[in-house]
């Protein structure tokens, strides 16, 4: 069969839409959201102080280590617990002693000796981790006599933070092994911070905001700052036209008035719904894909598409909001916590004690990432972390961080008010947008009665009742019942 056969297939048709976007990218390059403020300079590292006199290194006191090791070994020996080997990891404020007990010793026995070990070391805030997840050891954390301060500068200058391939990198501080700890807020997706007064919550918030200012251009992230204390976040007023978001007709970008919070939260819910509509039109699943598609000029701005910045909502004292506004705040916060993660709205909520009447179960379930500073009792620690341990911290920025699985002990980076002031001054002095980022309009029901009452629709006995009250010069339900022979 020698007849030659010619095979022909039709070429795939090129998608028109794609060609247009490719041509636009070839002609103009990818869309650059930072174009409007292209000369924006990020704050320099020089604006932060180095709080350590000795150049930021950790001073290792070998005598102290040896002494503590001997005390731990002796205490455990008294209770007939032999140790195969022991290893110390020195951190900024805490040293971790990892011990491997001899075979056949029950862990629960060591765990029950927590107070005895604390007594023999005469130290405050000892925590026993038995066993350390991922290692076959038991950890005993002992505070150092001379703690090293972790400055914000050392954390931000670290390669971990500078080379972080993250959407919203937050440098929280240093771990026990003195490594800088950087975590992505976009992956969390929301963060709950709690701890007693004066243990470093507001400093922690400042550290988070500072690390975002050091890593993100104003076009990429916007903050909504809610500050019922009125004084904690006022420094960030200077960067209003760069980084803050607010309702269109309000004066201050930082919300201190609790009634305005309700409008802002509801407006944020509208923003969330609008963003989901845009994502639905663009046929993408999250803000990262959406912005990538928009940068590649595949979405037409005439259809309402625009570059979407991340929005971070920071609430400094959540309990105060719940007391004054209650249910009206709870509903939008719960909605945002459940739904807002895919479209780049993230919540950071700080409160003294996240008990059920402050943070309901629904909201709490959507905050897998928790930070606990020192609290006074085991019950408080359980409320925050669902496990104990936060009651044994030292205070002053010593904290436990969890993302739903293991607890990690960190020393929070310290950032002082003058430093924040210098950073905001540096950013605020540069060319800015015309105004803060505007959230959608939301007009709540005007305060007053929300019942539908018609004034003409009066009771038959209204006039008599009015006369009785005027004559008696006082009014009560029982008085009207007696005089008008009702009920």
Question: What function would you assign to each model-found segment?
Answer:
Residues 1-190, 381:
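Low-complexity, intrinsically disordered P/S/T-rich segments
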Residues 39-43, 132-137, 141, 159-285, ...:
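P-loop NTPase catalytic phosphate-binding loop
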Residues 284-294:
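Short glycine-rich substrate-engagement loop in P-loop NTPases that contacts/grips substrate
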